Amino acid sequence: MSNFPDNKILIATHNNGKLEEFKQILKDLDLLILSSKDLNLDEPKETEDTFIGNARLKSRTSCNKSKLPCLGDDSGLEVHALGNQPGVYTADWAYTKNGRDFNQAMNRVWNELLKSKQKEPFTANFVCTLVLTFPNGNEKIFEGRASGKITWPIRGIGGHGYDPIFIPDGYNKTFGEMSDLEKNKISHRNKALKKFISFYNDYNN
């Protein structure tokens, strides 16, 4: 039977911004939330070509090493005018020899849109896929999406990644201009984690 020993769950990430988002959304659960960084676990390279493939890779690898239930996450930005790029390569677009530079990545998105000769609005989705792996091999999958559009120039300093160029549907400000609390209510990661919360609550009732 799958369970949560000692009410612990491992989040397979070294990304502090992502981890804080997880903790904020899951704060009402009776769970001790640990990260790969807390346990000194290396992050596997994202070698798959789908969100679910990369999330599963991270979840299984970290679960096998820690012997704890583990949530692996892969998320990204799909810009429709760019054929859903950067997609699973969202983080790669920010890669530099000195680490990730998301200002560079956001500039690349906008420059690619200008080269595409397509007209605004430049619709896009943020996608989050979560894979929950238990030490016995059982697995659950949760997905969330946030629809919106790309804007320029960069707006706001909040959030992380591409947040300052993404305006969610129904709003006139970017994720980067929102408070963490406001963003977390509508984000793709929130929608995926709400599905996990429903699973967790059903499991414990």
Stretches with model-predicted labels:
Residues S2-L10, N16-N205:
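Anionic-ligand binding patches
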